[in-house]
Amino acid sequence: MRYHQYYPVDIVNGPGTRCTLFVSGCVHECPGCYNKSTWRLNSGQPFTKEMEDKIIADLNDTRIHRQGISLSGGDPLHPQNVPDILALVQRIHAECPGKDIWVWTGYRLDELNAAQMQVVNLINVLVDGKFVQDLKDPALIWRGSSNQVVHHLR
């Protein structure tokens, strides 16, 4: 997996103070997407064990309380990203108790395959659906267009 940007302290992409990771790779290529640079799987930089360790350390840093992590992109549920996203989410569950996990994807919940559902079964919130320019609404919270759904899973 590759990623474009990591924010160790973020107050924009989800509730509270959190970490945010923007991964590479998106098959949806939504017109009007604000993050087109993340579409190509080979763009950005490699997601390494060192980066994963940094995320875990940041989530556990007691100097800045973080509510959790937001995973966006690109698309964290792109089939080629799922193995690394699953490993990261499993590690967060094991090593960062009480942290919530939000995932943004262009897939709808009812379109997800078994591998993608392994990730979804471990997260707190899934924001699903492609961004649709004609349905864009800046007043929406945590989503860009009105067709997207915020699923509070646990």
From Swiss-Prot:
Complexes and interactors: Forms a tetramer composed of two NrdD and two NrdG subunits.
Organism: Salmonella typhi
Keywords: 4Fe-4S, Cytoplasm, Iron, Iron-sulfur, Metal-binding, Oxidoreductase, S-adenosyl-L-methionine
Keyword Metal-binding: yes
Reported function: Activation of anaerobic ribonucleoside-triphosphate reductase under anaerobic conditions by generation of an organic free radical, using S-adenosylmethionine and reduced flavodoxin as cosubstrates to produce 5'-deoxy-adenosine.
PROSITE patterns: RADICAL_ACTIVATING
Enzyme class: oxidoreductase
The protein, known as: Anaerobic ribonucleoside-triphosphate reductase-activating protein
Coiled coil: none
Family: Belongs to the organic radical-activating enzymes family.
Reactions mediated catalytically: glycyl-[protein] + reduced [flavodoxin] + S-adenosyl-L-methionine = glycin-2-yl radical-[protein] + semiquinone [flavodoxin] + 5'-deoxyadenosine + L-methionine + H(+)
Binding-site list for S-adenosyl-L-methionine: 32-34, 74
